[in-house]
Amino acid sequence: MSKQQRRKGNAKNASSAAAHEYLAQGGATFVGLTPEMNIFEVASSNRLHQVVEIDDETRIVMKKLTKKDCQTREKGLKELMELINTENSSIESSYEHFCGLVAQLTTDGSPTVRMLTMKVISQFLTKLKKSASKGLKKIIPFVLFAKSDVTNGVAAAASAVIRDGFDADKKRQVVELFVPNTFDLAAKIAEGKHELSLPAEYDASEDLETRKMRLETQSLNTFLSYIKEYGNESKLWEEPARKLFSNSEFIKKTFAGKKEALKVQLLNISYKFSDNIEVILSNPVISTYIQASLDAQTFSTECATAWEGILILLPDERFHAKCSLQKGIYPRLLNLIRKKGNHWRVLKHYLLPAVSVLLQKLENPALITSIITSFTDNLPWQAEASMNAIHCWFCTFSDFVKWILGNDRINLEILKDLSPLIVEMSNQSMHFNTAEATECISGLIHWIIEKKVLENPAEFFDLLKTSIYEVAPPEKSRLFADSLTLPAKHLELAHLHGNLLSNPDVDFHIIRNLARASNSEYFEETCRNINNFEFIENSDRFDMLQAVEIVKLIEMKPSLSLQIKNNHVGRQLLLSENSEIWEKSLKNVPAGVFQEMVNFWHEKRNGKAIAQAVNFLKKMGIQLDTNAAAENVDFLISLLQSLDSKEDPEERKNLVLKLLSALFDAEDEPKLEHFESLKSHLNGDFEQFFEKLFANMEEEDAERVLEIAARFDKLVGFCDADSRGEIAGKMILGRREFDEMSEKLHFLELDVLTVSQHTTIITDALSRPIEHLEEKEATKMVKELGRLALFSVASNYNSSIHQLFAWQMIRVISALGNRYCLKFLDEELQQLRIELEKRVIKSEEIQKLINDGCCCAPNFITDTYGIPEKRQKFEEYSEDMDTKIETIYLKTDTPLEYVEKVFEASQSENSFPLFQFDQSKKYEWLANLTFVKRFIQCGGEIFRAENLEFRDFTLCGIITVLDTSTDILIDSPHSFSENPLLEALTTLYLELFVVLTDATKRGAYSEQSVEEWNEFYTPTIHTYCIRLFRTIRRDQQPTPFVRALLRALFVISEFPTSFSNDDDVANQEFIPELSVFKYPAFQESCIAQAFSLFASNNEHIQLIAYSVARLLMPIMFKLENAAALKSNEDSELPVSTNRRKLSLPVMISKSYPKDHHNPHVGPLLLDLTLLPLENTKDSGFSQEHRVAYCDVIDPFFKNALNALMLDQPFEFRQVPIGCRIPKSQERAYYLESDLSASPIFFDKFASRLLFKSMTLLPAAIRLFYKGMPNCFMPMFQETVTKYASRLLIEQELGKVREAKFEGEMKVRTVPVTGEIIAEYVVEETKMKLTIGLPPDYPLSVPSLTLDKAIVKTDRAKKWLLQLNAYLFHQNGAILEGIEMWKRNVDKGVEGVEDCTICMMTVHQQTHQLPKIKCKQCKNKFHSNCLYKWFESSNQSTCPLCRNNFT
């Protein structure tokens, strides 16, 4: 056992609970485990000794209540509460024990303990009810005491004990019964005579001084809270409190101390006595403290409490006898007024009452004068004084002056001293420059003017004017001057107001006060006192709001002549439309200034002002250019309202259309008055308005469409209830527009027809030629119609036609996404589809419209709405038609059963129209389309059919349809556009071919069935696919046929051989570079066709080109490199020095794009380039050929790799780099080849191609990386290391791990470190080669180490150098490098001589030994080394002896 465990065990054994358990097991009792054994429990031993025995669990809990740690006491109280709630039989005995601890717990140093104690008491009283009465004497006094606890939570819990523990009628009785004990307890604690004043020896929560202060405060609060609650109803508190005040030693000690809170509490208690003055005066220290605290500067309550006491004492003669009013209180009062400090916060409330009492007792006329003049003594204020105190000083002065002037009994001689005092206080208010101080003094002046109490007001206002102009600086006097002139009605202030306005730099508020003057007499008097009006002429300094006030002033005095500018004042004057101002100031203003004003309002989008100004100027004969404001709603509304009813209706309609466009195009929400103004002008015909609006909408956001719909609803909602439906019907989509728009979308119905599993409906439109739009044009159209559909269905005034249109557009958007499936659907179209799906509903009315043939493009609706199958009626009726239609709509349990039934019908006398293509007979097309759709559903189950004739018939049907379609399409390249149903049928049969091919690869079908499919049907269908490919054009759109052909071509693994040279080569493009290789005519035409399609702007067409070029690449490579692929390794001597080199197929280089318009073509061609390296067996590659081919493609590879980087699924411009590869999908992107068309096709293709390049050409990738600009290298390394290198290292290690080596060669891998360790035992000696792959492989070179070489060191180093060169420069694979190293070791041990040119045994490229022997010197050479010697020296002699080899 560890020391720590022993300590834990000892601690457990030391606990009282564990000890009791051990003793009980041994037969001992609890006797002997007394509190004396714990030094912290002695205090409770006496209490616990006298009560009845309690159970062990309760005793443990009780022990916790006396522990020194407050957390233990808290835990004990919580456990006790749980015991009380468990209905324990020992609750009563627990209660008796607890009562003995209440005194300690209710005064505990921890607030939590005190609060929990109150809750425990409350639980005991609730549980025990009457049984708890015997302990109330010990509990209730402390509960009442706790109601005054300094912690609010404890006080609230104590109040809850009384509230919840007793009935309502007994609460008062309980309080009165036990409160005397509480008062005695409180008095003793306050005097320090109670044992609870000292901290309990078990309580470590607070120190002595803190506990004493808390309990003393709580004790005095006990008296005050009782007095506050019961007031004069009870005097139970007086006797204990009087004893407290009779203890002169205690009172002196308290007031001599520094505990101001206790002093304030004692003062408040003394004020509550019925003979309070006698109690106060009996303790001189109290009255002394009161007088001394009248100017206390603290923010506590002692100052206010002292003033309460002085107001109690002042009227009483007994106080006068002990303290002279004339010599003591009066001088003290003057000092308090003269002193400028924080005590003014209190003095504000008590000065007037005190002075009033003092005046009654002292008949001294000079008293008031002394007091009022003392206000301005001892200035300036103390720096530490608060602004609140200063504001109180101002308010007190104002109230004092009003009190003096409003009291007739006071000598009016003081009036002569008031004027300078008020002026001085005005100076002080300007000095402090606060709103509160200014309002106090200016309000006093206004009051004095109203009361007319000044004998010489002119002199007073002269002093005031001098003070404003000369004493205070301008920035300080502005607020006071504004406040003084604000009412603008007292004529006494008009002279002052006029003088203030005569200053050119006068504050705007002074001007505003005059403009707002309601008293015309005051306005005229003020204007007479204005010396000049420069303050208005300098109009540039006023802002827009100020300009309104200035114009008011000018309108009140239109005689003023002003210079008008394009500023706020000038524009406001123009909008006033005042003829007097026009004649005086505006008439001669140049028109250019007015145009500038209009342009300004246009920038601020204030159309209302533009219209108002333009109309006014038009009346005055001035025309302005308003084109800039043509889209402003307020401007247009104002113009519309100003139109005369007799004017041209067409002009009115155009204006309404402009207004509608502006209203719905506005970014901000139009105002309600805009809708109100427009509602009366909606009587015209605006049916195509929203169609044009959405066609020209620049914002690509479905939310914007919803905003427009909400505005439309709001607009129509302002119209009369009876006309709303009619107006809405005129403006939004109608039946005719719905049909027209459905007609536009027919080119996408073909996409629905070929994928939908619902009933096919053959409409007249599908029998007519279809013009397929380009991607941008198609997307733009679908967006416009989608917006219109969302608007219509989102409006509250939508109908079933709008719902039908919305259902249709949901499928149209999906069809567009399917057509251009290599890209993600446009974000706005996604939003439109989501919003439409939220709002469409199904109803009987919509169902009826569909059944009645309301929809022109029903296949859209049937695919989304899911209507019940309804048999189509055909015009071409014959007697056997019913039977045929019955077969078409036949219900079967399985698709295979349906196909079989149709087969039987086709063999009957009625000759069911299968594989017949009469364009005029719709039912034949319906039969064929329905059949092939069910056949696709059937899938590989056809191979399980027991009826061989049925199976052969259906499979031969595929060949029949494709043969017919191919012949028709070759004869007429545009036949699919002219006959959409033929395209649909061909598409479905190509899909069927793909489905059946996949089924044979995955399904468990008989070998005979699969073999028959692969050997007979598949080659023929492959031939038709290639022939169909020959009809593809560069400008062709990705229609269902194009997409299906692409899927079918990706299924083909090699180019078909069953073609004659004359097949489909009539229109072959002649390419001189190809003609030199003498390709078969058909192959040459396919090559030319495939590589020409790479120039298409359509990605599906590019992929079709890639899919066919992928099949042709092995043929091209072998034919164009036929001479170079012939191996010369078996000949003894390479006599000829003109050996042919490998080359890249000519069409790959020729087809590489010269610009970046088609970014995917480069990577597609790069993948074709790597095919010979991927399939070395099919290409006839030797190691020498491989190295040579890598050298040949190097320039092309670097160029194509740059294009490949652009296609990678990374956002290199983001910080950090963004990745489009989903989490945990790295393997699917880098290791799996996925040729299914989807929006992530090129992301996956580029990722896989990069990984393939890293695998096949690691050295080329490394050199590409090293040649990158420095700014791109970290980004490339980060992405490769994070996503690809890990998988590549894992793949390389896997190849080595699965490889089998001959002899004593053992190879193991260490995946954690990326190491490969090759151990080779030769002649009982073990050699160890370690290859370490770095984390960013192949960007960094693997590390190579060799231990215990059995040959000379220089030779072992040569092997390592050769291996390093192979891996670093020649794109060698790790596994091949290990095998090369092993051959070097083997031949070195066998004694094989080195080639005397390269000085190596095994050739680095061909992995062959030196075989070519010189007849003269007998030295042997590698054939490749000798060939390079011949080529570089331009002669055929031995490099050593110079003997001629030829």
From Swiss-Prot:
Classification via CDD domains: RING-CH-C4HC3_LTN1
Subunit structure: Component of the ribosome quality control complex (RQC), composed of at least the E3 ubiquitin ligase ltn1 and nemf. The complex probably also contains tcf25 as well as vcp/p97 and its ubiquitin-binding cofactors. RQC forms a stable complex with 60S ribosomal subunits.
Catalyzed reaction equations: S-ubiquitinyl-[E2 ubiquitin-conjugating enzyme]-L-cysteine + [acceptor protein]-L-lysine = [E2 ubiquitin-conjugating enzyme]-L-cysteine + N(6)-ubiquitinyl-[acceptor protein]-L-lysine
Pathway this chain belongs to: Protein modification; protein ubiquitination
UniProt cross-references to InterPro entries, sorted A to Z: ARM-like (IPR011989), ARM-type_fold (IPR016024), LTN1/Rkr1 (IPR039795), LTN1_HEAT_5th (IPR056241), LTN1_UBC (IPR054478), RING-CH-C4HC3_LTN1 (IPR039804), Znf_RING (IPR001841), Znf_RING/FYVE/PHD (IPR013083)
Taxonomic superkingdom: Eukaryota
Function statement: E3 ubiquitin-protein ligase. Component of the ribosome quality control complex (RQC), a ribosome-associated complex that mediates ubiquitination and extraction of incompletely synthesized nascent chains for proteasomal degradation. Ubiquitination leads to vcp/p97 recruitment for extraction and degradation of the incomplete translation product.
Family statement: Belongs to the LTN1 family.
Gene Ontology cellular component annotations, sorted alphabetically: cytosol; RQC complex
Biological source species: Caenorhabditis elegans
GO function terms (MF aspect): ribosomal large subunit binding; ubiquitin protein ligase activity; zinc ion binding
Protein name (record): E3 ubiquitin-protein ligase listerin
